[in-house]
């Protein structure tokens, strides 16, 4: 998206239409607000299941000892912590996040747990990654893509920084597949979740946005096609918990 088109175009922020140039600021405000309670937010949104989803996401990644991994939207460091055990002493991880508050929480948490070796923290925008071409074996993004303004550009950037033979994996809230469950899920998302956000964090608006952002995120087949358009091959996805989340993957050849 060019600078001139960004000034005139609009995009969604939850269910609101906003100027594309303003979305990054609005999203930043949300995550600055919830950064210290980010795990609580995910617990409320997923009823605690997000921890199992993340473990499965990393366990099924084709990551091996010695790999160099970029974890985008690295947040509070959950994925980096799991990946560190997989890449071993010779591997390295770059934890990237556009939000300084989230990055600070992740850094503090990993340092407190003694995870310091061969781990780098970079504040970066997924739409303009500050890395050379073909420098990572694996790129991951967990619960972050739906907050990106220009998802197509972010996917192309993920493709660019991957080595040939590398894999990109995206874990994201997606489209529920069971019709009978959709009303229950909607009730939890739009009625229960904002109230819990207010009760535990005195912040209903941020939690309402996060629920809305899930509904605006591309469904599984559309995101798979977007990854293909970005250059990835062997694109596919796996639904977890009835499509509440999906793991998308693609390879660079």
Curated annotation (Swiss-Prot):
InterPro entries reported for this sequence: SAM-dependent_MTases_sf, UbiE/COQ5_MeTrFase, UbiE/COQ5_MeTrFase_CS
Entry keyword S-adenosyl-L-methionine: yes
Source taxon at top rank: Bacteria
Alphabetical keyword list: Menaquinone biosynthesis, Methyltransferase, S-adenosyl-L-methionine, Transferase, Ubiquinone biosynthesis
Pathway named in the protein's UniProt entry: Quinol/quinone metabolism; menaquinone biosynthesis; menaquinol from 1,4-dihydroxy-2-naphthoate: step 2/2; Cofactor biosynthesis; ubiquinone biosynthesis
Protein residues bound to S-adenosyl-L-methionine: 76, 97, 125-126, 142
GO molecular function, one term: 2-methoxy-6-polyprenyl-1,4-benzoquinol methyltransferase activity
Biological process according to GO: aerobic respiration; menaquinone biosynthetic process; methylation
Root EC class: transferase
Enzyme Commission number, as recorded: 2.1.1.163, 2.1.1.201
Xref: PROSITE patterns: SAM_MT_UBIE, UBIE_1, UBIE_2
Name of a matching Pfam family: Ubie_methyltran
Annotated catalysed reactions: a 2-demethylmenaquinol + S-adenosyl-L-methionine = a menaquinol + S-adenosyl-L-homocysteine + H(+); a 2-methoxy-6-(all-trans-polyprenyl)benzene-1,4-diol + S-adenosyl-L-methionine = a 5-methoxy-2-methyl-3-(all-trans-polyprenyl)benzene-1,4-diol + S-adenosyl-L-homocysteine + H(+)
Family per similarity comment: Belongs to the class I-like SAM-binding methyltransferase superfamily. MenG/UbiE family.
Protein role: Methyltransferase required for the conversion of demethylmenaquinol (DMKH2) to menaquinol (MKH2) and the conversion of 2-polyprenyl-6-methoxy-1,4-benzoquinol (DDMQH2) to 2-polyprenyl-3-methyl-6-methoxy-1,4-benzoquinol (DMQH2).
Protein name: Ubiquinone/menaquinone biosynthesis C-methyltransferase UbiE
Organism for this UniProt entry: Xylella fastidiosa (strain M12)
